[in-house]
């Protein structure tokens, strides 16, 4: 498809917004889902200071801004800021006129009905898009892996979901949500590094810790054994240079941080770990399809990028499932963007073209059309 008529695919995550053109194999723009407002009154008259900044610009000026995330736990909670993010996506990142392109948006599983309607309304009334569609994130990840049946464990920055999908349809009664994801792990790493005597407190310093997490953390296959190894030798230690030149060393924190995915009690949470949540989700499904779900367990989202996570999931789910069950964990290398990639695939299918909600249909039926056309 040509860029001039190609559909736009926008995956709005709690942490990052991924946007680009249908038919591409990767998003053109990936930027933080952040809106920042100045903390102090501007002193330089005529500097043309803005009253708000979005994405990378907000990130780079974080020292003088108060940063807000309009998407919490995968669900939009601040529509004015969300509109700013979409505006930034179309006009500054993709440099397109939204009134000339169909737009595919993604939503969290179990997104409230009112939210889908609000998204639809903003697209048609604020941005005047000719057509739009809202797709469930986990379903897109499954498409991106070349499947229509399986269970997706999608874990991003703000929320983790386990979503069983059969023949392309998500099974809502069996979807489970876990409010434990990347941001919680970053906060936990901040806490355990503080115990080491390093101080990280501000929102700006949190971004440094996020970088440490992404570069150095991994999931242990056997947590107790790894703890013993870390205690008896320095083989697991790695160093990291902070922006000010100070070098810090991190040891067992490297695997203690993501261990919280399997043992949420580390964060003082009573919920089940991601392995049990996946198992519970499968058990809520019809007995006849469980075999297909066990054999097609797909990992998706940035928080599944830790080295070692697939092997650990395999081990934990094997321990929970019936002993004869074949279990396969699929961890595609591009899983950080698999929701977006699935959207790109879907929006460029010829069979999908009749699925779009057109401006005409919206004008006739109003925002509730989204429940009839997008499922």
UniProtKB/Swiss-Prot annotation:
Gene Ontology biological process: adherens junction assembly; apical protein localization; axonogenesis; cell motility; cellular response to cytochalasin B; chromatin remodeling; cytoskeleton organization; establishment or maintenance of cell polarity
Effect of residue 146 to D: In CSMH; somatic variant
Effect of residue 73 to A: Abolished methylation by SETD3
Result of altering residue 70 to A: In BRWS1; likely pathogenic
Effect of residue 364 to K: In THC8; uncertain significance; results in reduced actin polymerization rate without affecting depolymerization; has no effect on ATP hydrolysis rate; does not affect thermal stability
PTM sites of type N-acetylaspartate: 2
Gene Ontology cellular component terms for the protein in this record: actin cytoskeleton; actin filament; adherens junction; apical junction complex; axon; bBAF complex; blood microparticle; brahma complex
(Microbial infection) Isoglutamyl lysine isopeptide (Glu-Lys) (interchain with K-50) cross-link site: 270
Catalytic activity annotation: ATP + H2O = ADP + phosphate + H(+)
Residue numbers carrying Tele-methylhistidine: 73
Effect recorded for residue 146 to V: In CSMH; somatic variant
Molecular functions (GO terms): ATP binding; ATP hydrolysis activity; identical protein binding; kinesin binding; nitric-oxide synthase binding; nitric-oxide synthase regulator activity; protein kinase binding; structural constituent of cytoskeleton
Positions bearing N6-methyllysine: 84
Consequence of substituting residue 71 to A: Decreased interaction with SETD3
Keywords on record: Acetylation, ATP-binding, Cytoplasm, Cytoskeleton, Deafness, Disease variant, Dystonia, Hydrolase, Intellectual disability, Isopeptide bond, Methylation, Nucleotide-binding, Nucleus, Oxidation, Ubl conjugation
Compartments in which it is found: Cytoplasm, Cytoskeleton; Nucleus
Residues found modified as Methionine (R)-sulfoxide: 44, 47
PTM field: ISGylated. Oxidation of Met-44 and Met-47 by MICALs (MICAL1, MICAL2 or MICAL3) to form methionine sulfoxide promotes actin filament depolymerization. MICAL1 and MICAL2 produce the (R)-S-oxide form. The (R)-S-oxide form is reverted by MSRB1 and MSRB2, which promote actin repolymerization.
EC number from the UniProt entry: 3.6.4.-
Disulfide bonds: none
InterPro entries, alphabetized: Actin, Actin/actin-like_CS, Actin_CS, ATPase_NBD
Function noted in UniProt: Actin is a highly conserved protein that polymerizes to produce filaments that form cross-linked networks in the cytoplasm of cells. Actin exists in both monomeric (G-actin) and polymeric (F-actin) forms, both forms playing key functions, such as cell motility and contraction. In addition to their role in the cytoplasmic cytoskeleton, G- and F-actin also localize in the nucleus, and regulate gene transcription and motility and repair of damaged DNA.
Disease: Dystonia-deafness syndrome 1: An autosomal dominant form of dystonia with juvenile onset, associated with congenital or childhood-onset sensorineural deafness. Dystonia is defined by the presence of sustained involuntary muscle contraction, often leading to abnormal postures. Some DDS1 patients have dysmorphic features, skeletal anomalies, and/or mild developmental delay with impaired intellectual development.
Quaternary structure and interacting proteins, as annotated: Polymerization of globular actin (G-actin) leads to a structural filament (F-actin) in the form of a two-stranded helix. Each actin can bind to 4 others. Identified in a IGF2BP1-dependent mRNP granule complex containing untranslated mRNAs. Component of the BAF complex, which includes at least actin (ACTB), ARID1A, ARID1B/BAF250, SMARCA2, SMARCA4/BRG1, ACTL6A/BAF53, ACTL6B/BAF53B, SMARCE1/BAF57 SMARCC1/BAF155, SMARCC2/BAF170, SMARCB1/SNF5/INI1, and one or more of SMARCD1/BAF60A, SMARCD2/BAF60B, or SMARCD3/BAF60C. In muscle cells, the BAF complex also contains DPF3.
Entry-linked PANTHER family: ACTIN (PTHR11937)
Protein name as it appears in the record: Actin, cytoplasmic 1
Organism: Homo sapiens
Lineage: Eukaryota, Metazoa, Chordata, Craniata, Vertebrata
Gene name per UniProt: ACTB
